[in-house]
Design a protein with these regions (language model features):
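PLP-dependent amino-acid enzyme catalytic core
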Residues: 1-196, 200
Length: 201
């Protein structure tokens, strides 16, 4: 399962092996995490300040530097949270012009994880997935559920069985399938990894 993209590919942090654009998060050979390796020369001529400023008021204005296929930006306006001047903190640390990004107002679920999920689900659509899943203790679950519902993708969320209901209320509101697993987050995450299909299957 692959799609062509000249701007980036996945590369293993440890062994250096490259995997093109596949739905992988870890190297199948050495199990090290994968990172996105960009061909900056491929975007240098087309990615300008003017083009950024003319783009939509969300993360998709930076699409040329996001690991998503061209033309696959969802219409959900994620990101573009405000910068707030932090005068008091700036005075304490000697920075007169200090601004802090306020991600407490990130659309749609008030979490910085909305940006990551938007990019992940854009790729899920490009690969043709009809169901996405994650392990979570709250914010990631809500973001995956909300954005999957918007895109018409099924979502299956694995959480620790003793997680407080308030943390995943929105997950249920958005219609995700919730699976409670006995154990802590690490155990839940391992369950997700073991049950996820391999792209080589």
């Amino acid at each position: 399962m692959n799609y062509s993209c000249s701007r980036y590919e996945l590369k293993c942090n440890e062994c250096g092996k490259r995997f093109g654009n596949q739905p992988l998060s870890a190297c199948p050979d050495c199990l090290a995490p994968l990172e996105v390796a960009y061909d900056l020369e491929a975007v240098r001529g087309t990615f300008t300040r003017e083009k950024i400023e003319a783009g939509p008021a969300n993360i998709w204005r930076y699409a040329a530097l996001l690991p998503i296929p061209e033309g696959r930006q969802p219409d959900l306006p994620v990101g573009f949270t405000p910068l707030v001047r932090a005068k008091n903190l700036g005075r304490r640390i000697g920075a007169n012009n200090l601004y802090i990004k306020n991600d407490a107002v990130c659309f749609p679920t008030l979490s910085f994880k909305d940006r990551v999920v938007a990019v992940a689900l854009a790729n899920a659509q490009a690969f043709g997935f009809e169901t996405v899943g994650c392990s979570s203790t709250g914010n990631l679950a809500n973001s995956v559920a909300a954005q999957a519902a918007r895109l018409g993708i099924r979502a299956c969320i694995l959480v620790p069985a003793d997680l407080e209901p308030a943390k995943i209320l929105n997950t249920l509101v958005y219609g995700a399938k919730l699976v409670r697993i006995d154990g802590n987050y690490d155990h839940v995450n391992r369950c997700l990894l073991y049950t996820s299909p391999s792209p080589r299957d």
